[in-house]
A protein has these predicted regions:
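A glycine-rich phosphate-binding loop feature that marks nucleotide/adenosyl-phosphate handling sites
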Residues: 244-247, 281, 296, 326-337
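Short acidic (Asp/Glu) and glycine-rich catalytic loops that position anionic groups and cofactors
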Residues: 203-208, 254-260, 286-293, 349-351, ...
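Short, amphipathic alpha-helical segments that act as regulatory/interfacial helices
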Residues: 90-93, 228, 279, 310-318
Length: 452
């Protein structure tokens, strides 16, 4: 913290408008934020910022911002003191648990801007009162990709784009979604890297590609396995890496034989000649190939295996943990700083853990889509209270009418958010939340290298 020549107070922090978490300067006058810009000495963004980050102060001072606790009455919303709201909510939680059991209460943590690190507190709370029912948006976003990578090589990491000879972007549009990643991609391009973009949509980054591959939505896995087949059948894969660091190669090689260029072309609509061209470029660039799968690959019924198939190309080309390839390594270990006990809770039958065991085993959390069925049917047991923080399932979940009916069936619905959302309108209590610029938290950057 410092003061500049204009007597402005300057504080350094991380922007949490997205996962990049750029370093920023906050300029304050009389305790009020008057400007935000990039922190030049921060190694991730090096002083650069996108429009979203520059406008983050609008979250704090927006005229529609929730500032006081609200209680729903027969006459509409009533402002009440925070202490009263917390006391009344606590009494109602106890009543629900006494009537229906400890598991009848749940927490749902959303991903509204700047709320990612609220997970640990939410988990700690719900576990402390005896319920395994922690929900988040991970059911629908990102974790499918994470699981796909973990099934391949144990973790998800970013590519070393500045040193890559080939950058392969699969279902991602970093100019709009990951600005710092795009900076590294531009460095790689300046250093001579070719770029292949695979996406059903002609995105901003696709327009900059050397090769743009437009395929049918959801067929990414077939294309990846077809490329794997070409590399293996032509003996253009990293035999040393495969023999030293992998298991199951023979079974994998046998499985991908059916993914001939002709078969893959029929599945994906990608021309046979283009499939061969991509394989040739990959073989020439290996091991300096930096892959990146976006969330687009996981938004299908075969989403996990789409990403899993692409991760196999990392291994075949020997790209893992090599300059210009995919970075591996331990981050600063935020998981070691969690405030909840990460222990198996299967014996408490968390919602969705039986039907979706892989998801539960990876995340130790419940399935949001199934929560609505549980509220409406009381199966496998009653779910009668929910506390949501920065989540808006009425807007973000499928089947809006079903979501509204399910939430209306609860004995207690509490929403904590920055604004009055569609879900908050249905709540019994609405609590104002602090924005990421108004609270202290531990964060790592998107490359898992820096703790701030």
């Amino acid at each position: 913290m410092s003061a500049d020549n204009n007597h402005r107070e300057v504080k350094h922090t991380l922007c949490r408008m997205c996962a990049d978490r750029c370093g920023v300067n906050l300029y304050l006058e009389n305790g009020r934020i008057v400007d935000i810009d990039g922190f030049k000495d921060y190694p991730v963004n090096k002083g650069r910022m996108c429009v979203k980050g520059r406008a983050a102060q609008d979250l704090v001072y927006h005229p529609d911002r929730l500032l006081k606790p609200l209680k729903k009455t027969d006459h509409g919303w009533q402002e009440i003191p925070l202490e009263q709201a917390l006391d009344e909510i606590a009494v109602k939680i106890k009543k629900v648990q006494q009537q229906y059991g400890e598991r009848a209460v749940s927490v749902w943590k959303g991903e509204a801007v700047g709320f990612a690190q609220q997970e640990d507190i939410a988990r700690r709370f719900i576990h402390a009162i005896g319920s395994p029912n922690y929900f988040s948006n991970d059911t629908a976003c990102w974790v499918g990709k994470y699981i796909g990578y973990c099934l391949g090589y144990g973790q998800w990491q970013m590519g070393d784009y500045p040193q890559a000879k080939l950058i392969m972007l699969w279902g991602v549009n970093p100019p709009y979604s990951m600005a710092t990643m795009m900076q590294d991609i531009m460095k790689g391009r300046e250093n001579g890297a070719k770029m292949i973009v695979i996406d059903p949509r002609l995105s901003a980054v696709a327009r900059q590609a050397d090769i743009y591959v437009q395929l049918r939505p959801g067929t990414d896995g077939a294309l990846a396995l077809g490329l794997a087949n070409l590399l293996i059948s032509s003996n253009r894969y990293d035999r040393d890496f495969i023999s030293r660091f992998t298991v199951g190669f023979d079974k994998f090689a046998a499985y991908v034989k059916k993914f001939t260029p002709e078969y893959v072309s029929a599945e994906t609509s990608v021309p046979v000649a283009v499939i061969h061209e991509i394989a040739d470029i990959m073989a020439a660039a290996a091991p300096q190939i930096a892959f990146h799968c976006g969330n687009g690959l996981e938004h299908h019924i075969n989403g996990v295996n789409n990403v899993r198939a692409v991760s196999m190309l990392d291994a075949l080309n020997g790209c893992l943990d090599t300059p210009g390839g995919t970075r591996l390594g331990e981050g600063p270990g935020l998981r070691g700083l969690t405030l909840y006990d990460e222990i198996p809770l299967r014996h408490l039958e968390p919602i969705g853990s039986t039907k979706y065991p892989v998801f539960y085993d990876f995340r130790q959390e419940c399935h949001t889509m199934m929560s609505m069925d549980t509220m409406l049917t009381d199966k496998p047991y009653p779910l009668k209270a929910m506390l949501l923080t920065a989540a808006n399932p009425v807007l973000s979940n499928p089947n809006t009418d079903k979501v509204k009916k399910a939430l209306a069936s609860l004995d207690l619905l509490v929403v904590r958010d920055l604004f009055m959302t569609e879900t908050a309108e249905l709540a019994d209590y609405v609590l104002p939340a602090a924005s990421f610029l108004e609270r202290e938290e531990l964060h790592s950057d998107s490359y898992q290298q820096i703790l701030a």
